[in-house]
Amino acid sequence: MPYLKGAPMNLQEMEKNSAKAVVLLKAMANERRLQILCMLLDNELSVGELSSRLELSQSALSQHLAWLRRDGLVNTRKEAQTVFYTLSSTEVKAMIELLHRLYCQANQ
């Protein structure tokens, strides 16, 4: 049930879903992981592409990607030796789209 202004929040629903929200918010609390999620919004990118766009070492990027994989926020697809990443769920996409509207489009 979505929260409507003036409507009481359903405490049981909130408790049930808050753990999933915390996982996503913790991942986004790190600037590099947030940047990775933003880059994956409408793109499937390889580790090499992410590394060059972020100007981040392969080992540092691997640690961030491992965090995102562990928490189920990204999907992977392997093609030969190349691993490609995409966002894993509509919730992740919706949150990144919201942040983009609030912080990126507002500045244009």
Curated annotation (Swiss-Prot):
One Gene Ontology molecular-function label: DNA-binding transcription factor activity
Protein keywords: Activator, DNA-binding, Transcription, Transcription regulation, Virulence
A biological-process GO annotation: regulation of DNA-templated transcription
Sequence ranges assigned to domain HTH arsR-type in this UniProt record: 13-107
Pfam families per record: HTH_5 (PF01022)
Signal peptide start and end residues: none
Family annotation (PROSITE patterns): HTH_ARSR_2 (PS50987)
DNA-binding region as annotated in the record: 47-66
Function: Up-regulates the expression of the hemolysin gene, hlyA, and may promote expression of other virulence determinants in vivo. It may have both positive and negative regulator activities.
PANTHER family reported for this sequence: HTH-TYPE TRANSCRIPTIONAL REGULATOR YGAV-RELATED (PTHR33154:SF28), TRANSCRIPTIONAL REGULATOR, ARSR FAMILY (PTHR33154)
Protein's name according to its UniProt entry: Transcriptional activator HlyU
Lineage, opening ranks: Bacteria, Pseudomonadati, Pseudomonadota, Gammaproteobacteria, Vibrionales
